[in-house]
Amino acid sequence: MTPLFERIETRRAWTDDERLVLDSVRRLADEVIAPGADTYDRSGDFPADNIAAITDLGLNGLFVPEAYGGNPISYRLYLACVRTISEACASTGITYATNFHGLGPLVEFGSEA
């Protein structure tokens, strides 16, 4: 992490619940995602195992309303999750971040039909 981001990070006031999410994401990034990062980056393969692990942790439901089984969080916390995952594996990070671009319009503009 660059000195600028380190300074910003020390000024953030995360709630206990947000810290729990960040700790879980950091553990996932360190233990599951980072070990295979070089392989995915070299091969160009889709990081299916990493995305499955992200899904298992519940991170793909972060912008889905609770009524539909989601676990909504702040955009700030989402960005911290994306950064942590991307630091571990750029391929996985961009794939995870792209999920929001597909999901966001569905949540925002979708109907019950």
For the regions a language model picked out, list residue spans one by one:
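General structural feature for long, well-ordered alpha-helical segments within catalytic domains
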Residues: 21-25, 46-50, 77, 81
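Internal helix-loop-helix
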Residues: 26, 56-112
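Intrinsic disorder at enzyme termini
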Residues: 1-20
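A generic secondary-structure micro-motif detector
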Residues: 15, 39-41, 71
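N-terminal capping segment at the start of a domain
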Residues: 28-38
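Alpha-helical hairpin
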Residues: 13-14, 46, 73, 110
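Short secondary-structure junction/hinge motifs that connect adjacent elements
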Residues: 36-57
